[in-house]
Amino acid sequence: MTEFVVLIPARLDSSRLPGKALADIHGKPMVVRVAEQAAKSKAARVVVATDHPDIQTACQAHGIEVVMTSNRHESGTTRLAEASVALKLPPHLIVVNVQGDEPLIAPELIDRTAEVLVENNVQMATAAHELHDFDELMNPNAVKVVLDKNRNAIYFSRAPIPYPRDAIRAGKREMPSETAVLRHIGIYAYRAGFLQRYAEMSVSPLETIESLEQLRVLWHGYPIAVETAKEAPAAGVDTQEDLDRVRAVFQTV
């Protein structure tokens, strides 16, 4: 398999769960749990990229490699662009971006996302899974993605896409039957050189409107290959309820 590294963007501020990166999960901070889970993949290296000294200290205390970045980043991708320079990663090296609030992420998904980047010879790859719940289709916190026939992303949105117009007109809570509805999984693969290119791209209006950093890539004309996972991954941690659920999982391990 082609060599890749995992970079984990981590910040302390969180509107819905303040300080969640350092939230205790069965004796270890969440960001450490994420890094340890990522280390189970085939990654040659796992590094946390942060702007907060408390996260740096926590990672170092648990033997996790960490790099400090600016506190001015508005997205994890631009943070990783800075980190890749600080780490002197070669432009061709594949970087997998694993979110810092995914302590249950499957190592196999990390590996597969890196493989999809290589197989499709694109600048960026990500993943999605089929969605079968109408409430999730309508939920703006569940990001949806629609694909073209080559399995590249056409668009990502918090809105319900594709929109089941006829069903909704008829007052029915039915999912579209003509095609699968896909929920985006927040994992990305790209080469270190493309991270630098991303950071130099102008911010797109769609990215700002939807608050979705990947839309910058589509706006500037680059394809994003999408792997459809066979099953939904474990949910990340956005709320106290999510954190309680994850803690319960680790207590049984």
UniProtKB/Swiss-Prot annotation:
Gene Ontology CC terms: cytosol
InterPro entries registered for this protein in UniProt: Cytidylyl_trans (IPR003329), KdsB (IPR004528), Nucleotide-diphossugar_trans (IPR029044)
Annotated protein name in UniProt: 3-deoxy-manno-octulosonate cytidylyltransferase
Keyword Transferase: yes
Keywords on record: Cytoplasm, Lipopolysaccharide biosynthesis, Nucleotidyltransferase, Transferase
Gene encoding the protein: kdsB
Location(s) in or outside the cell: Cytoplasm
Cysteines paired by S-S bonds: none
Enzyme class: transferase
Protein family per UniProt: Belongs to the KdsB family.
Pathway recorded for this protein: Nucleotide-sugar biosynthesis; CMP-3-deoxy-D-manno-octulosonate biosynthesis; CMP-3-deoxy-D-manno-octulosonate from 3-deoxy-D-manno-octulosonate and CTP: step 1/1; Bacterial outer membrane biogenesis; lipopolysaccharide biosynthesis
Primary location class: cytoplasm
A Pfam family hit: CTP_transf_3
Superkingdom to which the source organism belongs: Bacteria
Alphabetical GO biological process terms: CMP-keto-3-deoxy-D-manno-octulosonic acid biosynthetic process; lipopolysaccharide biosynthetic process
Record carries keyword Cytoplasm: yes
Catalytic reaction(s) noted: 3-deoxy-alpha-D-manno-oct-2-ulosonate + CTP = CMP-3-deoxy-beta-D-manno-octulosonate + diphosphate
UniProt-listed HAMAP family: KdsB
